Each structure stands twice: as structure tokens, then as C-alpha cells.
């Protein structure tokens, strides 16, 4: 296992509460951001947070007081996360962007200090061909503080997984959108995490976890010449306790599931 071994067992709240999990993971993000010596008054972009405040909490921990653009295509989620950002980071300037990734470039600066995205690829796979009606169908449950997947989400994944050609086309679109984002915004840093979601690890959605992880590896291969070495990232992740829990020790704290890009 990766991470720091402990005799202490994992807190039950981490397995049942989104807010508890967000707080735990925000510490990891804060360490990664601190180790990259990013400007506290810089220009950041967060991609597809949903209603999760992990990144906002991490930015608070590093005393961030710059500008951040939040790209979230699901309008209800954007309103909720905007309220959280304004509460957590009252001194930051927050720009909400209610667009899909490929449609947001005109709303963003031509150069940014850092692009951050926590666990975006599974949702991007699910909603790539989407519209507001699909977002409502798939993600209306994200505001609840309970780890469960709704039936509409599962059914949509089943439909996608039965159409391999369509799924491969979606994967190519996702990769191209990230590469276009880098081209259009010239980020100093790009940071993405994509480990298996505990809530997706049962039933047919377990394959969505694997699909999203594979997609991260493909994106890393496109950017390999500008990536921070995994052993450096691993040293940072190893500072955190794994509680002898498989998801933490083998996935969340495993550098293979993190992409840290630095502009050459």
C-alpha cells in the first residue's frame, strides 16, 4: 500500500459522508498545490467540481486570494458550488462559467497559472454528448450528502457500455477537449486526479471507474514530456495515512492516479 501506515482504522464518516471525504482529500490537494509553489494571488481554473468543495477547501488551506474560474456545465451544481466558494474563499474573485469544457474557452484568460480538476473523467464520459436535460437526469442527486448512485446514472452507463464504438468516440472527445484547453489557456500547471470512486465500485458502474482511470493514463501519455515524475508526486502522497484501507492505500494515494503537468 501507498501512504503512511497506521494502526488507526478508517473513520466510518469517510465511507458515508461526502463532506467528510471532501475535507480529507482537500488536505492532499493543499499539499500538492503548496509543493508546486503556485502564486497565492494567481489565476486558477477548476474543471467540473459538481457540488464538491474539495478544491475550495484546499485553496483556503494555502491562503489563496487570487481569481478562480469554475467551469461547471450543470447549472444547479454551479449555483451550489459558487455559494460554497464565496463562503470558503471570501477574498478570492470567483468567475462562474456554465459551459461544457469545449465551449468555455472564450470565457477564460489566454494564460492561467493552474488548472485543477478532481475526479472529472467519469462524469465527462457520462455527459459528453449531453444537454441540460441529461445533466438533470444524471446528476440531480449530487447535492445530497450520501454516498449512493441513482438509477438513472447506472442505466445511462449500461447503455454506453453496450455501445463500444460510441464509448471510444466519447473517450477521444474527452482527450481532445483537455488538449484544446491546454492549448487555449497555456497553463503553468495542470493537475487532475482520477482514482476509483467508492460509490461506483459496486455493480456495473465499476467498469466506469476503470474506463475513467484508463482515460487518465491516455491523457498522461499525451503529456508525458511535461509531467512531474511519479516518484516526486508519490513522496507527497505518502505523507497521508492509508488507514490500512484498500481504496486509500492502493488508489487515492497512488501517484498513477494523479496527473501533474508543468509547462516546460
What do the predicted segments below correspond to?
Residues 74-76:
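Conserved SAM/SAH-binding beta-strand->alpha-helix loop
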Residues 82-107:
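S-adenosyl-L-methionine
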Residues 201-264:
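Class I S-adenosyl-L-methionine
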Residues 112-169:
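A short SAM/SAH-binding and catalytic strip from SAM-dependent methyltransferases
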Residues 51-65:
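Conserved SAM-binding loop of SAM-dependent methyltransferases across substrates and taxa
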Residues 1-39:
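Class I SAM-dependent methyltransferase Rossmann-like catalytic core
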Residues 40-51:
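Conserved class I S-adenosyl-L-methionine
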Residues 65-71:
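Short beta-strand element of Class I
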